[in-house]
From Swiss-Prot:
Protein name, UniProt field: Protein BEX4
Organism: Mus musculus (Mouse)
Listed Basic and acidic residues bias regions: 28-44
GO BP annotations, alphabetical order: chromosome segregation; negative regulation of protein ubiquitination; negative regulation of tubulin deacetylation; regulation of mitotic cell cycle
Protein role: May play a role in microtubule deacetylation by negatively regulating the SIRT2 deacetylase activity toward alpha-tubulin and thereby participate in the control of cell cycle progression and genomic stability. In absence of reductive stress, acts as a pseudosubstrate for the CRL2(FEM1B) complex: associates with FEM1B via zinc, thereby preventing association between FEM1B and its substrates.
Length: 118
């Protein structure tokens, strides 16, 4: 790729020389292009990348089965659906946060005997 950029720069300088010999003025754009191409050549990819904050899904209704049931009838089923809905919310949130949560290991009994951190 570097050779392509160098070839383009060489072609632009040749065109500029031809225009100067003819007495015509080279356009401002053609003067800036070689400089711009050199800048692009020196840049490293991925230098200006920001991390995005992952947002949790606000609507969990898609995961609740039988959501078109009439809420006034059913008695015991209503409580079961409510519990099931809260479990679905908890599980999906847990799945989304899992890559960001570190492993939590309990401290051994003698942890403070060997721990150097005050």
């Amino acid at each position: 790729m570097a050779s392509k950029f160098k070839q383009v720069i060489l072609d632009l300088t040749v065109e500029k020389d031809k225009k100067d010999k003819k007495g015509g003025k080279a356009s401002k754009q053609s003067e800036e292009e070689p400089h711009h191409l050199e800048e692009v050549e020196n840049k490293k990819p991925g230098g200006n990348v920001r991390r995005k904050v992952r947002r949790l899904v606000p609507n969990f209704l898609w995961a609740i089965p039988n959501r078109h049931v009439d809420r006034n009838e059913g008695g015991e089923d209503v409580g079961r659906f409510v519990v099931q809905g809260t479990e679905v919310k908890r599980k999906t949130t847990e799945q989304q946060v899992r890559p960001y949560r570190r492993f939590r290991t309990p401290e051994p009994d003698n942890h403070y005997d060997f721990c150097l951190i005050p």
